[in-house]
Amino acid sequence: MRHLSAAQVARLAGVDPGARPYYRALADGVRARIMDGQIPVRVRMPAERHLAESLRVSRTTVTAAYDLLRERGYLESRQGSGSWTALPDPASTAENPWLSTGGDGLIQLHSAAPPAPAALREAMLEVVEDLPRHGMGNGYDPMGLPLLRERIAARYTARGVATRPEQILVTAGSQHALHLVLGLLAGPGDAVLVESPTYPHAIDAARQRGARIVPVGISHEGWRPDLLTGAMRQSGARLAYLMPDFQNPTGALMDDATRAAVTAMARRHDALLLIDETWQELAVDEVPHTSPMAAFDTDSRVISVGSASKLWWGGLRVGWVRATAALARRLALHRAVVDIAGPVLEQLAVARLFDRLEETRAERRRALRASRAALVDGLREHLPEWTFTVPRGGGTLWVRLNGDAATPLAEAAAGHGVRLAPGPWFGLEGTLEGYLRLPFTLPPQVLTEAVVRLRAAREHGPAGPAPVPASLSAMV
């Protein structure tokens, strides 16, 4: 195991000698360096006495800092073996932001999940009638139902990327797909580039592997290849997770020139790109044509992840991975230790729904456009201090609060009947407190009422305690 000297930790932590309380500033400095990769995971920290001498503080101060790091999950210790850096286990935290309460009567603005389209009921009824034709085997296919893999491959081909069914692995949603890919390709201490802000479950999946998260900032204007390149070079990352199509939460859309530059960057640094296309089909306005990231890939560096949840319905729990045929098979072997295969009925339904793709896209576009207008108009009328860029697709607004803090606001809003997803959920360790993600996937009248309640929460604080959770629902 690598060691860090007391002098190295003192330099990297960069604590102002006048900071008060000093132990907390020291713990924050060490944590920040772990999160940006300057202090690697699984390296031995100096003994408390040595670090205290280097910093010219009492040993009690360093002991308190180490205790705080252990409490937060950034330090592990064993009697006689010393202490070493770590990453927190998301499952051990008191508040798990990936699961938020549902069934409590609140307006659920923490979740960007559209309702089921009209075509879903028809598709389900049809596949129930058709199921006996597919029920002669044992029902287990780790790669996914051949019919559905053909439909997904055909859609990629129609979008400009020739794809064979053997390149497709059907999964239990995009989150399952992310876990499979990261579980196979990322290990403890490996650097993984992510956007900041980004999809929270991607951070969760990488952390569960013990990977070192390297955030790279993006804005409503999009991605800067020079920043991505610099972060990849400095961190040594060989895997980057990106969402170029109506990015969650900003709604940004990456243009083709940037896609080409990013894939060229991956080629230069011998890195893989894990591309999340969950929102790809949901352009709300007319947008310039963009090609899939895989269209710029000349040497199999792009692994694409898709989902039925946003276009059709989250309850279907069907997603997929597009990769090389060899990698798709490796992922299928990897998934077999967890769930063997996906349910046939839902896969048949999604295969049917692909036949209604354009119909559903048009239905979604109309609904999202109306809901987006209601949310935007409500915010401009009732909360004009908040600013945002209206996205041309996807399902979320990334709102800058301009002086308000998202976490206290979310706590107050729950007392007014609105559940929110504050900015820190989409960043690392308390960053992005000045932002809020607001989805426009609910009906217009619900969003109008939600904004009125948000104004009351901002002006008056909690109207009462947040409802006691009745059940759990996913934050997506």
Language model feature labels by segment:
Residues 194, 215, 275, 350, ...:
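Hydrophobic residues in well-ordered beta-strands that form the structural core
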